[in-house]
């Protein structure tokens, strides 16, 4: 599991872990809990160009369907095929095996710190 305090976050409940010019992206445990049992995940394809703030995928649960937003501009370099095959990883390990995509970026926008995100969700 990733150290959650070292991550950056969006108001749309995604987390971002930066390693050089590649960001690993997932949804937070808060979002996974609100969704309920995740049963389907649709992700962008490797090579897709993402624009920050745009819808890039979908996540379906037994309770609802939610949109996945690109937290940053960039190019998808890897998708987590394990999550596509076993969507429950989003619930069981959202900050680890439940990551969604890796994106190569040129500039990182200002995102929320862990403390700012915790204040946003009130937990």
Swiss-Prot record:
The keyword Zinc does not apply. GO terms for cellular component: cytosol; glycine cleavage complex. Binds 1 lipoyl cofactor covalently. Transmembrane segments: none annotated. One of its GO terms (biological process) is glycine decarboxylation via glycine cleavage system. SUPFAM superfamilies: Single hybrid motif. It comes from the Bacteria. The glycine cleavage system catalyzes the degradation of glycine. The H protein shuttles the methylamine group of glycine from the P protein to the T protein. The glycine cleavage system is composed of four proteins: P, T, L and H. PROSITE patterns: BIOTINYL_LIPOYL, LIPOYL. The keyword Amino-acid biosynthesis does not apply. InterPro entries: 2-oxoA_DH_lipoyl-BS (IPR003016), Biotin_lipoyl (IPR000089), GCV_H (IPR002930), GCV_H/Fam206 (IPR033753), GCV_H_sub (IPR017453), Single_hybrid_motif (IPR011053). The modification N6-lipoyllysine is found at residue 63. Belongs to the GcvH family. Keywords: Lipoyl. Its cofactor is (R)-lipoate. NCBIfam families: gcvH, PRK01202.1. Signal peptide: none annotated. Residues 22-104 form the Lipoyl-binding domain. This is Glycine cleavage system H protein.
């Amino acid at each position: 599991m990733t150290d959650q305090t070292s991550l950056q976050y969006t108001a749309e409940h995604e987390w971002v872990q930066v390693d050089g010019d590649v960001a690993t992206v997932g949804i937070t445990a808060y979002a996974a809990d609100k969704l309920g049992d995740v049963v389907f995940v649709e992700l962008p394809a490797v090579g897709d160009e993402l624009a920050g703030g745009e819808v890039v995928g979908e996540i379906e649960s037994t309770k609802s369907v939610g949109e996945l937003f690109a937290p940053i501009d960039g190019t998808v370099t890897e998708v987590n095929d394990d999550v596509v095959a076993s969507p429950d990883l989003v619930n069981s390990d959202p900050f680890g095996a439940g990551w969604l995509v890796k994106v190569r970026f040129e500039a990182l926008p200002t995102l929320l710190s862990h403390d700012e995100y915790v204040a946003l969700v009130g937990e």
